[in-house]
Structure formats: structure tokens, C-alpha cells
Amino acid sequence: MNISFFLKPKVEVKYLQDDCSVQQALADMLESGFTAVPVIDKTGRYIGTIGEGDFLRLLMRTPAEKAAAMPVGQVRRRVTHRTVSMDASMEGLVELVTDQNFVPVVDGRGMFCGIITRHDVIKYMTGIWKAKT
């Protein structure tokens, strides 16, 4: 099944602009309860996903005041989250969600469209398995 039915669109997703400060990003993540969020540039292009571990590694090697003011887009990310396009299938996401809480969805120009959550992939696959039994 095509992922468009399960897409959580950009307007409903917590994401960060790449020029957002680390201090603001951490405050936003703490408030939202998310441990990782997509990062996009000013044009809406997906840059990557940043997580709590990325911030912790930054704080371990950078003075706190300098780290707090650093733009999120300059923080080194340990993991590169793989993206999919709108024509991807839910079945094709199973492998991706074993390592990612969500899968970023981008268009042909790399513009961020939204996400598919691990929960939705599991729910979809469980429904298929139940239908077969």
C-alpha cells in the first residue's frame, strides 16, 4: 500500500529549522517530548534528523555557551536517517523503522513532506497479518 494514507504531513510534524539555536532546539524537544526531530532548511528541504544523542555528544566536546548558540544545522549527526518518496510502499518501510522512530518523506526535489511513524508501519503490518489468518 502507498504511504500517502499514513503520511503525517509537515504541518502536523515537529521539525527544526537548520538555523535554530541548539538551546532553542533542546527547549522545543523537551516541551514536545520527542527524542529526535527532522531538520529542514529555509526553503523546506530536508537536511537530516537530529536526536538527543547528537546534542549530548556536542555538549561533551563543546563549551556549553558556545554549543547553546550553535545553529542546529552545524551539529554533527551520528546517524543518517534514510528518506523515502511519496510513491514508497508501507511494506518497504519495515526495514527502515527497525533503526528509525520515523521515516522522513521527501518529494523529488528533497523538500520535506512529512513523516511515517514506526507505530503506523507496525499497525499496518499487524493488520495485514491478521487479515491473512
Model-derived features with residue positions:
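Bateman (tandem CBS) regulatory domains
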Residues: 1-13, 68-80
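Regulatory sensory and allosteric helical modules in signal-transduction proteins
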Residues: 61, 77, 82-84
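A short, polar/charged loop-to-alpha-helix boundary motif
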Residues: 54-69, 121-133
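A glycine-centered beta-loop-beta connector
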Residues: 29-32, 37-54, 97, 105-120
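The conserved cystathionine-beta-synthase
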Residues: 15-33, 40, 82-100, 106-108, ...
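Short, flexible segments with low predicted structural confidence
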Residues: 1, 26-27, 46-48, 64-69, ...
